[in-house]
């Protein structure tokens, strides 16, 4: 998971959770799916029924709470109503950009655009090109959608994911995308809080609660001032003074801090060291999976800027199930409904060029080739660098890519034999030297819901020294850290809660490593090569390495292609049709 994310007037949603999609009893699942009461609950989840109690007769479920005499039960979850995001400036700007594709003049000859990579950047590019009346041909190397939000199902029917993905209110393009697809109800919004473990008090947590009655930035200031467990008043004052130049100088000041690490900036601004220990280490690991002595301060300031400027910016939501099915497939269905193509198991092996150094075709690993009017690389930057043609390597924008490299990260999933009590229906900052953030997904996510057993999903970072270690070593180290977070429930030797199974997902090159002086190296979506474009969170956009950054990069890439329509249809490349040749 990477981030850019109480006194709330929203009441907790008190609703019946559907049995996980991995229910071993297909007949029971069909019974639930056919029952009209479930359809009613699903249809109303994010509307009039928020904050109400549903009583539904038991349909073969295990009891989670004590049932009443009439055979009904109540299951409590902490989902909150969707926050009011639609009137924020950033949301409206994102909505305007989305509308520009739908409202654009229909092309006489739709462009056939070949896109490599079906992560969020590639899916976004294809979606908005299709909205503009063009035909995207999206190629995914693997057999699963999503790229860095991919997930897989094991033999037991349980999903395990590439990362712990959190959706913030400060993600305007992502929030617009959910609305455009009609899937806003798939986001499970949580209480507006940030919750940190207390390393010096094993098993205890400290909270920053954002009051709903105050506008930004006062709700954030209130949350910080009310928390007296992590920083003293003196430290808070010095921290605030250190941040004053960012508040006064705005975006130009933020961009100028790209040359400094977080620690260097703190020293320059006279910010106490304990602010690093109590706040910035956790933020740095959540934002970019690295520590403050490596992370560019620009990254921290951008996140703080979003959280302090937008009332609901730091409010978080979990997706209600696995990302490939619950988010990526609706995008694919939208693309296909407008005439686009999406192909799995289609790995680009080579970018073959014309004599003028423009792209002639993509050669796939099975020997087939595909041609089009324009080409997009929406893969991680490390894959682009591997496949970059020799003829392009002396071009300055491609040379600068050498500064950009993906950061390693590990995602750990642990299934226990019991329900853990010392957790929340929320994202938790572990403040562990080995772990970043974690969540009990059996509580926070509907599809993974389990009334009897906990499933912890944890981000193991920084991972440089662990990426080559065995899965068992990583799990053993994780359990030792969890014994500090759950001292009464988890022991490293499993003498308490028993580990039923685990999955470890290693990503040697994840989002680009946001170290100092990276900003000038990030390329625009439109390259100097006519008809060749880039998408990905490493490309130039204001949300850095995040899901929001990936989606926005795809929109900007699609915008560049639409703007270049006349140039593209007039070239020889435009005379070729996009089709597969074996």
From Swiss-Prot:
It is found in: Plastid, Chloroplast; Plastid, Chromoplast; Membrane. Belongs to the carotenoid/retinoid oxidoreductase family. One of its GO terms (cellular component) is membrane. Coiled coil: none annotated. It catalyses: 2 a plastoquinone + 15-cis-phytoene = 9,9',15-tri-cis-zeta-carotene + 2 a plastoquinol. One of its GO terms (molecular function) is FAD binding. Expressed in flower buds and lips. Lower expression in leaves and roots. Keywords: Carotenoid biosynthesis, Chloroplast, Chromoplast, Membrane, Oxidoreductase, Plastid, Transit peptide. One of its GO terms (biological process) is carotene biosynthetic process. Residues 1-93 form a transit peptide. Pathway: Carotenoid biosynthesis; lycopene biosynthesis. It comes from the Eukaryota. Substrate binds at residues 306, 545. FAD binds at residues 121, 140-141, 148, 165-166, 171, 537, 547. This is 15-cis-phytoene desaturase, chloroplastic/chromoplastic. Its EC number is 1.3.5.5.
């Amino acid at each position: 998971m990477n981030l850019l994310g109480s006194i709330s007037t929203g009441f907790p949603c008190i609703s019946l959770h559907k049995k996980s999609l991995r229910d071993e009893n297909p007949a029971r699942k069909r019974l639930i799916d056919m029952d009209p009461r479930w359809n009613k609950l699903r249809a109303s989840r994010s509307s009039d029924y928020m904050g109400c109690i549903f009583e539904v007769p038991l349909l073969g479920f295990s009891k989670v709470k004590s049932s009443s005499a009439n055979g009904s039960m109540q299951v409590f979850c902490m989902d909150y109503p969707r926050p009011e995001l639609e009137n924020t400036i950033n949301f409206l700007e994102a909505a305007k950009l989305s509308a520009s594709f739908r409202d654009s003049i229909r092309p006489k000859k739709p462009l056939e655009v070949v896109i490599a990579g079906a992560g969020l950047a590639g899916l976004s590019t294809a979606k908005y090109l299709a909205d503009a009346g063009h035909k995207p041909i999206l190629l995914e190397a693997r057999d699963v959608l999503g790229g860095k939000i991919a997930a897989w199902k094991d033999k037991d029917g349980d999903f395990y994911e590439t990362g712990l993905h959190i959706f913030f209110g400060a993600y305007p393009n992502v929030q617009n995308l959910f609305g455009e697809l009609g899937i806003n109800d798939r986001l499970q919004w949580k209480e507006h809080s940030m919750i940190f473990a207390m390393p010096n008090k094993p098993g205890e947590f400290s909270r920053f609660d954002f009051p709903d009655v105050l506008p930004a930035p006062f709700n954030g200031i209130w949350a910080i001032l009310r928390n007296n467990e992590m920083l003293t008043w003196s430290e808070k004052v010095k921290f605030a003074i250190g941040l004053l130049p960012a508040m006064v100088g705005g975006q130009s000041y933020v961009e100028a801090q790209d040359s400094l690490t977080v620690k260097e900036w703190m020293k320059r601004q006279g910010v106490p060291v304990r602010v690093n220990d109590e706040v910035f280490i956790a933020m740095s690991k959540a934002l970019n999976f690295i520590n403050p002595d490596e992370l560019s301060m620009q990254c921290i300031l951008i996140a703080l800027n979003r959280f302090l400027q937008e009332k609901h910016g730091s409010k978080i939501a979990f997706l209600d199930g696995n990302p490939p099915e619950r988010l990526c497939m609706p995008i694919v269905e939208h693309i296909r409904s407008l005439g686009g193509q999406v192909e799995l198991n289609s790995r680009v092996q080579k970018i073959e060029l014309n004599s003028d150094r423009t792209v002639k075709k993509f050669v796939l690993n099975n020997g087939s080739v595909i041609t089009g009017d324009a080409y997009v690389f929406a893969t991680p930057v490390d894959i682009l660098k591997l496949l970059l043609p020799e003829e392009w390597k002396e071009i300055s924008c491609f040379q600068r890519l050498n500064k950009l490299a993906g950061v390693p990260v590990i995602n750990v999933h642990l299934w226990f034999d019991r329900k853990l009590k010392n957790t929340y229906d929320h994202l938790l900052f572990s403040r562990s030297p080995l772990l970043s953030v974690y969540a009990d997904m059996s509580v926070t996510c509907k599809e993974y819901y389990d009334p009897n057993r906990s499933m912890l999903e944890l981000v193991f970072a920084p991972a440089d020294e662990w990426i080559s270690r065995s899965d068992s070593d990583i799990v053993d180290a994780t359990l030792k850290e969890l014994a500090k977070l759950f001292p009464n429930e988890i022991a490293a030797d499993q003498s308490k809660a028993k580990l039923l199974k685990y999955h470890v997902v290693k990503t040697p090159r994840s989002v680009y490593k946001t170290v100092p002086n990276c900003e000038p190296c990030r390329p625009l979506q439109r390259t100097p090569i006519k008809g060749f474009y880039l998408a990905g969170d490493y490309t130039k956009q204001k949300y850095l390495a995040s899901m929001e950054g990936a989606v926005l990069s795809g929109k900007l890439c699609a915008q560049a292609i639409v703007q270049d329509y006349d140039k593209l249809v007039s070239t020889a490349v435009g005379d070729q049709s996009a089709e597969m040749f074996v």
